From Swiss-Prot:
Ranges of biased composition (kind: Basic residues): 125-136
NCBIfam families for this protein: PRK05309.1, uS11_bact
One cellular component term from this protein's GO annotations in UniProt: ribonucleoprotein complex
Originating organism: Mycoplasmopsis pulmonis (strain UAB CTIP) (Mycoplasma pulmonis)
Subunit structure: Part of the 30S ribosomal subunit. Interacts with proteins S7 and S18. Binds to IF-3.
Entry-linked Pfam families: Ribosomal_S11
Protein name: Small ribosomal subunit protein uS11
A Gene Ontology BP annotation from the UniProt entry: translation
Organismal lineage: Bacteria, Bacillati, Mycoplasmatota, Mycoplasmoidales, Metamycoplasmataceae
Signal peptide: none
Gene of this entry: rpsK
Length: 136
């Protein structure tokens, strides 16, 4: 008879020795995602307001974004990150809180770049809502 194999396999996290990297902060109206990568774009660590444990409207707060940045930066420091270039995308509440938390965590910030996409006369806007008067 065949032997039963264990269904769960665990992977040992390999430590990446990277000193310089890029911190991507993607802040939307509902959530903030912080990703640390090396200069080529390979992801080292990431965290979001949702992975920390917040749900619903609490995910979009600046406090939750700061905790996400703190969590991601601690993981990145374990892999050797010491200096980052911060790229901020989006218009959410947590963009400044996440950036400040990265600076406070002990990782030096070399530059801050806003890469929020700007529409150059993008898509057609929705049609205007007609206001109706109440019948007396």
């Amino acid at each position: 008879m065949a032997q039963r194999r264990s269904s769960q396999t665990t992977k040992k996290v390999k430590r990446k020795n990277v000193t310089n990297g890029v911190a991507h902060i993607h802040s939307t109206h509902n959530n903030t995602i912080v990703t640390f990568s090396d200069e080529k774009g390979n992801v080292i660590s990431w965290a979001s307001s949702g992975t920390i444990g917040y749900k619903g409207t609490k995910k979009k707060t600046a406090y939750a974004a700061g905790l996400a940045a703190q969590n991601a930066s601690e993981k990145a420091k374990e892999h050797g990150i010491r200096e980052v270039s911060v790229r901020v995308k989006g218009i959410g509440q947590g963009r400044d809180a996440a950036r400040k938390q990265i600076e406070v965590s002990g990782i030096s910030v070399s530059q801050i770049v806003d890469v929020t996409p700007q529409a150059h006369n993008g898509t057609r806007p929705p049609k205007r809502v007609l206001k109706r008067e109440k019948a007396r």
